[in-house]
Every structure is written in structure tokens, then in C-alpha cells.
Amino acid sequence: MSHVVDEVQNQPELWKSTAIFITMDEGGGYYDSGEVQPVSFFGDGTRIPMIVVSPFTRPDATDHTYADHVSIVKFIEANWNLAPLSDRSLDNLPNPQQRDGEYLPATAPQ
């Protein structure tokens, strides 16, 4: 992955308008410093890391805002004012770009 990032960063015209989203397809299990949601139809299970590499990101910043894989699609739709790109992004919850405060699914522990 670092090869791709280096290639883009070495092209100033491309880099100045780029955001690279790096995420994994699954979490690392139940060893987690944060809340681990129960896995159910509505529960999210373990957290999945995402790294954004861009000239627009703050150096050394860590953001704990709730997001999921669909959040990337929703970001693209909102940023470029596009219609929903897939059936999975038709809803507006959770939509980290429009929610204030922390989001926990309905199956969160009480």
C-alpha cells in the first residue's frame, strides 16, 4: 500500500486533490479498547480501522467517529452531490456526516 501512496504523493498535480481511503474487510476480533457491538442483523460486531491519507487530513489526527464500509460510499455521494450509488446507501442512518454525537446501534448494551 505504501507504494501506491508514494506514487500519488510524488505527483503534485494529482496529490493536491486526492484522498486515499485504506480499510480492512474485517475486524481483528474481540480484543478491542472500544465498545464491541454484538453481531446480529442490526449489530455491527467488531470495529474496523480506516486510514485516510490526503493533503486535507490533519497531521497525527485520530478520529473516533462511527463509520462503516458504506460510510465511504455515503461520503462520495455527499461530497459530489450524487444520487445513491447502491441500495445499501439509500438509508441515512448511520450517516456520520449528518449525525451529532456518538452512534451506537439499537443492539448496544444497556
Could you say what each language-model-derived stretch is?
Residues 1-110:
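N-terminal pro-sequences and low-complexity stem/linker regions of secreted or lumenal proteins
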